[in-house]
Curated annotation (Swiss-Prot):
Expressed throughout the cerebellum. GO terms for cellular component: cytosol; elongator holoenzyme complex; nucleus. It comes from Mus musculus. Its main location: cytoplasm. Belongs to the ELP6 family. Pathway: tRNA modification; 5-methoxycarbonylmethyl-2-thiouridine-tRNA biosynthesis. The keyword Cytoplasm applies. Pfam families: ELP6 (PF09807). Component of the elongator complex which consists of ELP1, ELP2, ELP3, ELP4, ELP5 and ELP6. This is Elongator complex protein 6. InterPro entries: ELP6 (IPR018627), P-loop_NTPase (IPR027417). Keywords: Cytoplasm, Nucleus, tRNA processing.
Length: 266
């Protein structure tokens, strides 16, 4: 995890909110550093994590995780992390016969966009057994990233329904958290992605939007991050609070600073 980002969000692994949906989105830049932050953050917070990884392999996330001080292999072995590797699983679904329903069964059912099997997998993974006391604080669902589902032929409405069920189960019933990344196809005519992004924005308690610089590439400033808190339970004046910072990604950290305040230009 990145300590400076924790400071901006006023949170630590020992002090976290429960029952929240966090939306990560990136526009004209790579926002995967946010996924790595929240993955390592919740593992360090001793949460049970179900990670639906549709973009990269387990080894990729594990290598980055080690740089951030967590071992995904160890977390998986002790049952804290359940990792659904989309790249590997999709090959199994498409080219091998399955005796039982697979979380990515919708790949075989072209045109249906039915994510029921994926939701059932998440539900079974995160729901504690009735007779057991969970050693973990609370459950967390992390998805990287939802835009991939659209590219695989699932409709935006089906993805929104899926996320609504996940939020009802994880956030409301189990008092856990959901974190999901969505690409923002800014300027492109992609109605499905816009529908998904707008729908999730209205449901989210926290939105982190990473975007490239309008002026183009800069060696010392890699992009800017907008943070929007949405607190429905607060008074009207406190419901929405927004901050924007610029950032630079380093090998094992990300540094944040106010616009135009990069150490390289001061």
């Amino acid at each position: 995890m990145f300590p400076e980002l924790n400071n901006l969000l006023s949170t630590t692994p020992d002090k976290t909110e429960q029952g929240t949906l966090t939306l990560l989105c990136d526009a004209k830049t790579d926002g995967s550093f946010l996924v790595h932050h929240f993955l390592s953050f919740y593992l360090k917070a001793n949460c049970k994590v179900c990670f639906v990884a549709l973009v990269q392999s387990f080894s990729h996330y594990n290598i980055v995780g080690q740089k951030l001080g967590v071992s995904l292999t160890a977390a998986r072995d002790r049952g804290q992390l359940v990792f659904l590797e989309g790249l590997k699983s999709s090959v199994e679904v498409l080219f091998h016969s399955q005796d039982e329903p697979h979380p990515l069964q919708f790949l075989r059912e072209a045109g249906t966009g039915n994510l029921q099997s994926l939701y059932t997998f998440i539900q079974d993974t995160l729901k504690p057994a009735d007779s057991e006391e969970s050693p973990w604080k609370y459950p967390v669902l992390l998805v990287d990233n939802l835009s991939v589902l659209l590219s695989l032929g699932v409709g935006a409405v089906a993805v929104l329904d899926f996320m609504q069920y996940c939020r009802a189960t994880v956030c409301c019933e189990l008092k856990g958290n959901v974190v999901a990344l969505v690409h923002d196809t800014e300027g492109a005519t992609d109605e499905g992605n816009d529908t998904l992004l707008n729908g999730l924005s209205h449901q989210s308690h926290l939105i982190l939007r990473a975007e490239g610089l309008a002026t183009g590439f800069c060696k010392d400033v890699h992009g800017q991050l907008s943070i929007l808190w949405r607190r429905p339970s607060r008074s009207t004046a406190q419901r929405a609070q927004s901050l924007t910072y610029q950032y630079k990604i380093q090998d094992k950290n990300v540094s944040f600073f106010a616009k135009g305040m990069s150490p390289a230009v001061l």
